[in-house]
Structures are given as C-alpha cells and as structure tokens.
Amino acid sequence: MSQGQFRIEELNPFMEWHLHATAASLEIASESAREIARKIERRTRVLDEKGAVLAEGDP
C-alpha cells in the first residue's frame, strides 16, 4: 500500500467488503471507520497491510 498503511472497508448491501479509504495510522483509521459507519449506517472494519482485521465499527 503506497498511500496509507491501514485500509478502511465497509460492508455493502451485497454483504461484500468494499475499500472505502486508507489512513497512515491505526488511530485515524479507527476513528474514520466509526464515523463512516455512523454516516452510511453500515458496518466497517480496519485492516493492516497484511489483511488482518484490527478494528470494527457498527452503525
């Protein structure tokens, strides 16, 4: 990953994870995931560059 080391994904209506944003720090990624979950009323998660889930957010 060149832009951000943490991926923020959202669970779309088809129950597929979709890349929503990237962030350089886990703190920013987690905060963004919570905010996105509230705004779009969908579940979100934060992954590291290896694909491990580090945080999840519920609407």
Per-range role (PLM):
Residues H18-R45:
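Amphipathic, hydrophobic secondary-structure cores in small proteins
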Residues M15-A21, A52-E56:
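Surface-exposed loop/edge segments in extracytoplasmic proteins
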Residues R38-P59:
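Short, mixed-charge low-complexity intrinsically disordered segments
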Residues S2, S30-S32, G57-P59:
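A signal for specific C-terminal beta-sheet/loop modules enriched in small/flexible residues
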Residues M1-L19:
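Short aromatic-glycine-(Arg/Gly/Cys) micro-motifs in beta-strand/loop hairpins
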